[in-house]
């Protein structure tokens, strides 16, 4: 038990422990003994029965009934369909049982229609009426057949009535009569029927359920919204009131957007909205309202009328359209006619392809291409707006390919959803827009696209005009359907006028076209367009045209190949035949703006066989889903999940990554629902902390119990309450529902948030808690886990450091348990804060008679710094003289008063100097600079950073990892045992790495198998990084981008790090052979006596390990017998193990020894794995073991070859041999079924292994005398050729790979150069480079593992592997992802030569603060304006100013140093000498291209130069300046007080309490009289409690708790005793 939560018992709503909650049980008062069960449903039933028996059953009954009713409905479903519910269907049923209306967001094959048909049957069995609305007559017929089939299977009889156009006259009349009389249980019609027959037949009908199967068709008549609401039980009057709320909310939104807010008007609107909402809720309470289920749309539900569902039913219709892509994007540079490339591609790729022709080539070329492909024997048809017959033929399988024009609203681009048929897309040119300079036949979206692209080329005045026009046009068309936009475009083309709003849009469209025509006449603009690398300017038949990429069409068209379905996202392939390089560049750039993870490869570099295999595997799955034959295993892949984050902004942002979400109101909270293929995800914001310590129980909210005679501290929590009127936050009610400060009843209780979360938790299979990635976030996650545990079967923690789509998906894959150590640290932090704060605050109240005062351990020393600085400030006033010299230099002279007319330059130093950039921001440096440069308070900066944060790697289990103690073990074992000390490589030298996190994830997807020339391989996820040398350059490359012919870094000559040695009893203990531990010593003593008291050594030296090696090679274990098929080893056994009795036969020797047999068995002889302790031994022991293995199973014929069936052991030996500098290769003889370990470096073998050989030394000597010794080779010929040598030495290299020792020798003669320096570093490096022979992609289902470590890498299978940005961080480390972001921006926007990647420190739990995309501030504003980047809240000018600060600092940190001509001069004045420094000139701009240099520019000076004084100013001021907020935060960081997450809060508290004020203008901090008195009192009376040193010590102790190095209960006890000693 760690804590008690008041009011959280899921049965009686009383107090309950965290232990009971996490075990999914009610409190001890309800149930004396807990009930434990792995099966969630069984647990619900068992607890319910126990509560009922005890007579304490209350709210638990609701949990039980819900599960029971779901089971009953599932039984009927199984009878009706033959299947059990899918996870998502179970979620939908739970909502229906609880009377909730909702929108279904679900991919193909999720059974939406089947569910709608079934649930209407279920309602009918309960005497309730249902209405199913479908778009067309065929679907009416299909639904009727489906229901009739279900009724027959379930043996259920209901009154089914349907109406469609294919009925005979008499059947129609009968159906209409039954509808008129309400003589039905289930009614099925089309949307058209509802629109035309509502008044006549349906207006007076009330339905318990309406199921709308296709909302797009349903919404074509917007009045269907009102009609459906009336049929559910709403009156026209209450619908009218809801419409008023919608209009009032629009007015309120406009008011809130104004910078000058009319608070009175806002309050008035809020009250009116609240009043109408209360009326609506009252109406729903008094009237029985039915349930509406709306199946997902493919388009957006536009218009305000749809919002009636939000106001009356609590949900908003989302879109089923997904923005997820699982596409291998490729390109091909044409070397022959495009048509021939297409033919070649079709023959390679097979059937099921779409071929898109760029719009500039048009329908004529599409027809020609279709005819040409037919002539080549392909079954292909052209599809256009006028000819759609090909679609039907394609769907039936009568043709294999479709050709169409790549235009956004084209039939082939948008109207096709055939995930089981479409495998790939070929683009016969880059999708593009082409504009003539006079903009003939403009469309609205093309005009917007062109304006967006060229605005940056316009003069400032025109740019401003263009931005306004652009913004107006985008805003006006936001909710206009496509067919209405086409009418506006036609009106412009034909010179017609329209009416009302449409005419207004037409006018703005016309102005935009005229604006473009005007600016495109400007030659300077045309010149800039021609120079731009992302736009193309072409002259065709004497006419100029601009071409820009049509990225929306590419996304839609390629997206036909990758669709969401039940189980994931189908893999697709896209091939672009590049017909214009500049437009292609533009397309790539825009795709990366939209998709952070976008990557495009050359077609010929793709492993086509593997890609097609995976594509076809997905198509098979989809077919099974569509046919209803999918296996239960695949069904289980689609889980319903609830993701909980802290803030609503973050929830909105995450939801937007996956399409247009459906929304539901749950109490005061909004839940967003999206599909991500394998999960139906509901995203909800918790609102941050929901619980805090109570004030009226225990010692300031902490119970002090006894545990084995020691104090045991248990915090008591209750929900946080906040008054909406006065802002007061509290925990305990003085009077229920009333704010204790102002008496208002307008109080929000976080209990409502808990209720909302519990309501949603009931619906889902798993909960993912994504609170912030720090100790505070971990504690919030722990609270959420505890209070939701009884309501959901599975709860996990997810952690992400940047809010991007890949980061979220990765976090979901890598979901983990709560980190209890982090929670413990936060418990200590909060309890310590409460105890100190309450005790000292009460003392302040008594002394100063003011209950608004407070104190804290951290804020007191910080207040002290400000008080002390103010004292220094007031005592340091002096005279200053400011002079401006004739050359413009400003000089300030301290302690000076009087006149000065001339000065002399006494001394000058001028030199060239490199100026390095600063590292990226940490929290403290960001707060300092935001204070210094932008004038932002710490609190404001943190809030802006939070807004920006919210807007915006693994291997298989058999992978061997090297630990820092020498052991080599499988990564699965390392993770399971939490092995912290790993071996990594830093600067190509070995370095110990501490594992900060251990990752174990479930994987069902592709992995890459990288096979190396030395026989080793690594099996990893596509994004797992390896250290690679390619074309003479070293860098991290993800597995998916590694190519055959690359060289991978492999550990080499590190030196062995193990040093263990054992006695026999110690080895028994290490191996866990406890049953023999005591008897072993006794047995040895007995043997000593038998041998005339001769002393027997039980130290296991190299002889013992040699014997172990022999047994590994040619030994076997039979019970207690050790049998060895190598008789020559007998003398060694007699020498090393004198206490055993040896037996012999014709071909073997052996001995019987129960203990030793068990030892060898556990060490790895036989079937078991080689025990990890072996590689922790001293080097000579391991070498002796290898020698024994060679003496048993080795041969020496030109090379040393060890043969064994135990490939697992040879693999480990191979890694070890590389570590001690012996190059080797692994090879499998498939025919013989054995592995070979081949060593060609006989020189090293002789040094390391040979001394321990006993049987085959002579064999080795013979081979060694005649064989060539092959050592390590480096793949550096391309660099080697660039070396320059002194006369007489010729540089000639024939092979790519050169022996390391030869490189070293030759380098001695080479002239100094960067190439020589690089090659020297490779020679000295503790890695070798092994060629990649083959890359395969395989499907893998199972566990994968990884670490987060203090270095960026660890050793896996001998290979250097990379291990798996948040604004609360003290790290300056930049990840590979961050470096890639910088590289893309710097190379594209500034110049490749400026880029210099820097890691800036070792990797930890956090990364430096950085942008997540290569987008600068100007471009970010444009992309938000264009709607390409969507954000959850409007960003202000201050947001962009802070973003710019972060962006420039980060990009500068990844650029080359600036080189300046530096000047430092001593200027002699009549008063004193003054130093002046700065730069005369910038010799190389480097990082200063993006950020200002920290020095001022000054003119060149000469020694002895006399300069006239132009201007003199005299003033008096303090020498010491007051602190700003930034200065204080820098001190906190420097002195180890506070944490990144608390810096801003501490300063804010001092300001709020009135201890400190901030001056206007310069924003300096000044202590108030109150602040000075409070500080003096605290430091006088309680110095030992609040001193800076004690505070710093406590920070370290809390870090130790977080790292599991200190027990949190011991720390609390120490704190408690300390407070008792000084205060109580």
UniProtKB/Swiss-Prot annotation:
Start and end residues of each Toprim domain: 640-803
Zinc finger (RG C-terminal-type): 720-749
Location of the Helicase ATP-binding domain: 93-256
Assembly and oligomerization: Monomer.
Domain comment, as recorded: Introduction of positive supercoils requires the cooperation of both domains. The helicase-like domain probably does not directly unwind DNA, but more likely acts by driving ATP-dependent conformational changes within the whole enzyme. A beta hairpin in the 'latch' region of the N-terminal domain plays a regulatory role in the enzyme, repressing topoisomerase activity in the absence of ATP and preventing the enzyme from acting as an ATP-independent relaxing enzyme; it also helps to coordinate nucleotide hydrolysis by the ATPase domain with the supercoiling activity of the topoisomerase domain.
Subcellular location: Cytoplasm
Binding locations of Zn(2+) 2: 723, 726, 739, 742
Cofactor binding, per record: Binds 2 zinc ions per subunit.
Cofactor: Zn(2+); Mg(2+)
EC number: 5.6.2.-
Domain Topo IA-type catalytic: 819-1623
PTM section of the record: This protein undergoes a protein self splicing that involves a post-translational excision of the intervening region (intein) followed by peptide ligation.
Region of interest (Topoisomerase I), ranges: 636-1624
Family to which this protein belongs: In the N-terminal section; belongs to the DEAD box helicase family. DDVD subfamily. In the C-terminal section; belongs to the type IA topoisomerase family.
Catalyzed chemical reaction(s): ATP + H2O = ADP + phosphate + H(+)
Residues where Zn(2+) 1 binds: 9, 12, 27, 30
This protein's UniProt keywords: ATP-binding, Autocatalytic cleavage, Cytoplasm, DNA-binding, Isomerase, Magnesium, Metal-binding, Nucleotide-binding, Protein splicing, Repeat, Topoisomerase, Zinc, Zinc-finger
GO MF annotation terms: ATP binding; ATP hydrolysis activity; DNA binding; DNA topoisomerase type II (double strand cut, ATP-hydrolyzing) activity; endonuclease activity; reverse gyrase activity; zinc ion binding
HAMAP family assigned: Reverse_gyrase (MF_01125)
UniProt-recorded name of the protein: Reverse gyrase
Function of the protein: Modifies the topological state of DNA by introducing positive supercoils in an ATP-dependent process, increasing the linking number in steps of +1. Binds to single-stranded DNA, transiently cleaves and then rejoins the ends, introducing a positive supercoil in the process. The scissile phosphodiester is attacked by the catalytic tyrosine of the enzyme, resulting in the formation of a DNA-(5'-phosphotyrosyl)-enzyme intermediate. Probably involved in rewinding DNA strands in regions of the chromosome that have opened up to allow replication, transcription, DNA repair and/or for DNA protection.
Top-level enzyme category: isomerase
Domain DOD-type homing endonuclease: 1107-1222
Positions of disulphide bridges: none
Catalytic machinery residues: 1366 (o-(5'-phospho-dna)-tyrosine intermediate)
